[in-house]
């Protein structure tokens, strides 16, 4: 009888051991994780298992095309670094205007974007603290009577801005007497300004400086009329992702990544934003 009990115990132990081994083997089997099984920030930032980054060629401080025609610049560097941190491939989705970028974020056509902080845009997306600050400037013809920024907002003055740009949004709120005329994109501002005989062009200082070099008879007004805080934006509803990207932005500023990228791409007219409070 004792031998029978020992035999049953041995068989039970053997069976349990076999089951444990089977469960362990099953637990260590590897299978691809779908996006829904990823950690929360990755699932929110890359719901298609790739990071779709909006790159706006309308702002040359953030993005240009290199000699091979490929996207290059600070925003491209940041997008690729974020993709590396998340362990997902990066898809660069290119645009020619900030207004179109905002629409793409609003419609979740992209996962991250590089846009100016503005209360109007903030209604349609989540935004991080700024990573750079950019100066906005005015351009006039050499024979213009306008000499100071304070003289621009006067009756009879027509100011050309890129449709949907940060300057458009800002001046729409602030102007009292001058009239806004909207070019289709920011890079087209000076050409519209010249072709239609307007009084003032407004935009990124660096872009306008390049236009003044390209076209004769133009000058920039001294100083700046506004400072743009450039941030990263995400579609609404991705709060965990926004917290992750906000921390990423702060690290990129503190580590010198942003400053090094600006210098590598020979960008002038932009400064690394101070730490968020």
Label each PLM-derived region with a short phrase:
Residues 27-29, 35-36, 73-85, 143-144, ...:
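Extended ligand-binding regions for polar small-molecule ligands
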Residues 57, 133-143, 205, 209-250, ...:
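Periplasmic-binding protein-like
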Residues 51-55, 150-166, 179-181:
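Short loop->beta-strand "edge-of-pocket" segments that line small-molecule binding or catalytic clefts
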Residues 34-116, 255, 264:
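Extracytoplasmic small-molecule ligand-binding "clamshell" domains
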Residues 89-97, 161, 178-186:
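Short beta-strand-to-loop elements that line the ligand-binding cleft
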Residues 22-25:
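C-terminal motif of bacterial Sec signal peptides marking the signal peptidase cleavage site
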Residues 99, 116-124, 170-173, 194-226:
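A ligand-binding cleft/hinge motif common to bilobed small-molecule-binding domains
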Residues 76, 80, 84, 89-153, ...:
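Acidic, polar ligand-binding/catalytic clefts
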């Amino acid at each position: 009888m004792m031998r029978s009990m020992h035999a049953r115990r041995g068989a039970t132990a053997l069976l349990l051991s076999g089951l444990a081994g089977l469960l362990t083997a099953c637990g260590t089997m590897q299978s691809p994780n779908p996006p829904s099984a990823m950690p929360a920030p990755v699932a929110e930032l890359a719901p298609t298992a790739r990071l779709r980054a909006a790159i706006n060629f309308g702002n040359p401080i953030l993005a240009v095309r290199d000699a091979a025609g490929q996207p290059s610049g600070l925003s491209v560097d940041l997008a690729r670094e974020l993709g590396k941190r998340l362990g997902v491939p990066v898809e660069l989705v290119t645009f020619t205007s900030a207004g179109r970028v905002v629409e793409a974020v609003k419609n979740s056509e992209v996962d991250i974007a590089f846009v100016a902080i503005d209360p109007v845009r903030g209604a349609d997306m989540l935004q991080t603290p700024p990573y750079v600050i950019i100066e906005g400037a005015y351009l006039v013809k050499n024979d213009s009577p306008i000499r100071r920024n304070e003289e621009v907002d006067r009756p009879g003055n027509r100011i050309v801005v890129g449709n949907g740009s940060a300057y458009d949004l800002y001046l729409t709120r602030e102007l009292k007497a001058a009239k806004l005329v909207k070019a289709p994109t920011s890079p087209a501002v000076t050409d519209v300004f010249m072709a239609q005989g307007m009084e003032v062009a407004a935009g990124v200082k660096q872009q306008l400086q390049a236009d003044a070099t390209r076209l004769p008879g133009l000058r920039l007004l001294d100083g700046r009329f506004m400072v743009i805080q450039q941030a990263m934006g995400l579609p609404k509803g991705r709060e965990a992702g926004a917290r992750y990207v906000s921390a990423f932005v702060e690290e990129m500023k503190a580590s010198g990544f942003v400053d090094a990228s600006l210098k590598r791409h020979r960008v002038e007219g932009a400064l690394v934003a101070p730490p968020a409070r």
